[in-house]
UniProtKB/Swiss-Prot annotation:
NCBIfam families: antiphage_dGTPase, dGTP_triPase, PRK05318.1. This is Deoxyguanosinetriphosphate triphosphohydrolase-like protein. Residues 7-28 have a biased composition (Basic and acidic residues). Coiled coil: none annotated.
Length: 446
């Protein structure tokens, strides 16, 4: 398929700017970087509860680190596979994907996502990656109705789960709750896919694909993940595979660094959960470097810890390979990046360490639970009387949606998911706390 079709935008542009010689993907990167949705990431913490000092990462600093790792992966692949240089394309494209990958995530992390998904259970559901696709293509006001109006290849790259939610949803056996405080995230996991409300944009992105490629790319299968009832997609584009690897590496390594600095993960936990597995790795580099990395990670000398973090990131980045799936015709689907098996196992061990000792930590789960209550309370209030409580511009979107017979509840999810953690908390206090003051400062923020 010609590269020009992947550089097309949904809405044609005739902007004539003096001496502007940027490539289409450089323009995409600029639009994302200067967007309000991207700026809001600075006020959404990467891991709830670790923000008690100024060292912690936000979703914005995380996205910047993912971008740096993503371009590092591309540079390594370009040297390792010179025949794939044309496919790797622009560094600005990969930066765009990495910078934008978390834009759709709501306040309060997974707690906010589950809460919105529950409140939207009869209206198409909610999921952070689906919301990212929606913001980029429809909501961000760079254009009147086409969002950031990004290139087709950029939109293909952001598709982590390329299928509409209606094809993926499997009804659970759990009854609906009678009280918001009873909501258990494990019983209401979001469907990982595109909202059906955005199926027209999804169709446009996939337009250049052959019938066979599209059918295979959007095919679904039962999930192998325990306690996840919904179906899962099977494939992603080449660009998306690089972005997802960069995200996984940043999550496993940099979030681990945060946890070590704050004393959440200890050297004894490392020796108990990581060392026994990795010392038997089939890769000699992992076996040889393990002890030194473990010692430096928990050193009181900051430069030694940073050296260990750099060694880990470099180890993963240089262990990425390109796989060929000849069942696809389109090169962007035929080729995917992945970690060598031993390094994939090592990365999973680190991710499980972060999940076990950080994400599942009761104090952090309490904050996530609190966020759930805030999000559900806000949604319930706005849904009860949208034309009374929503900001004027959101009221207008809600009315338009109602008049056109569209999903007006999606407008409520759009509004709440765009909030920062702090803004959502203040607005909740404004609505439900008798001691809250004027809402003048609230009206200025969104």
């Amino acid at each position: 398929m010609s590269s020009s079709v992947w550089q097309e935008r949904r809405h044609g542009e005739d902007k004539q700017r003096r001496n502007d010689h940027r490539s289409p993907f450089q323009r995409d990167r600029a639009r994302i970087l200067h967007s309000a949705a991207f700026r809001r990431l600075q006020a959404k913490t990467q891991v709830l509860g670790v923000g008690m000092n100024d060292f912690y990462r936000t979703r914005l600093t995380h996205s910047l680190e993912v971008s740096q790792i993503g371009t590092g992966i591309a540079a390594q692949l370009s040297r390792k596979y010179p025949e794939h240089k044309p496919l790797l394309g622009s560094m600005s494209l990969l930066e765009s994907l990495c910078l934008a990958h978390d834009i759709g995530h709501p306040p309060f992390g997974h707690g906010g996502e589950v809460a919105l998904n529950y409140m939207m259970r009869h209206h198409g559901g909610f999921e952070g990656n689906g919301q990212t696709f929606r913001i980029l293509s429809k909501l961000e006001p760079y254009t009147e109705a086409f969002g950031m109006n990004l290139c087709r290849r950029t939109m293909l790259g952001i598709l982590k789960y390329p299928a509409p939610q209606s094809l993926l949803f499997v009804a659970g056996s759990h009854p609906e709750i009678t009280n918001h405080r009873q909501l258990k995230p494990s019983q209401w996991p979001p469907v990982k896919g595109i909202f059906d409300d955005d199926s027209d944009i999804f169709d446009w992105v996939l337009e250049p694909l052959s019938v066979a490629d599209r059918a295979r790319f959007t095919s679904v299968q039962p999930s192998l993940q325990p306690n996840y009832p919904h179906l899962r997609t099977q494939f992603k584009s080449f660009d998306c595979s690089i972005m997802e690897l960069a995200d996984d590496i940043a999550y496993a390594v940099h979030d681990l660094e945060d946890a070590i600095v704050m004393g959440i993960v200890t050297a004894s936990q490392w020796q108990q959960d990581v060392a026994p597995t990795l010392k038997h790795s089939g890769d000699p580099w992992i076996r040889q470097e393990l002890a030194d990395i473990g010692t430096k990670l928990f050193s009181h000398e900051h430069h030694l810890r940073k050296d260990a973090i750099g060694t880990l990131v470099n180890g993963f980045v240089t262990a990425i390979i390109i796989n060929d799936d000849p069942a696809f015709e389109e090169p962007l689907l035929r080729f995917n990046a992945s970690l060598e098996p031993e390094f994939a196992n090592a990365l999973n061990v680190l991710k499980q360490l972060v999940f076990k000792y950080v994400i599942r930590k009761p104090e952090i789960q309490m904050l996530e639970y609190k966020g759930q209550q805030i999000v559900m309370g806000l949604f319930e209030a706005f849904a009860s009387d949208p034309e009374r409580l929503l900001p004027l511009n959101t009221q207008e979107r809600w009315r338009t949606s109602e008049q056109q017979g569209q999903n007006s509840h999606r407008v409520l999810a759009d509004y709440i998911s765009g909030m920062t953690d702090e803004f959502a908390g203040r607005l909740y206090q404004q609505l439900f706390s008798p001691k809250a003051g004027s809402n003048v400062e609230l009206s200025k923020e969104m």
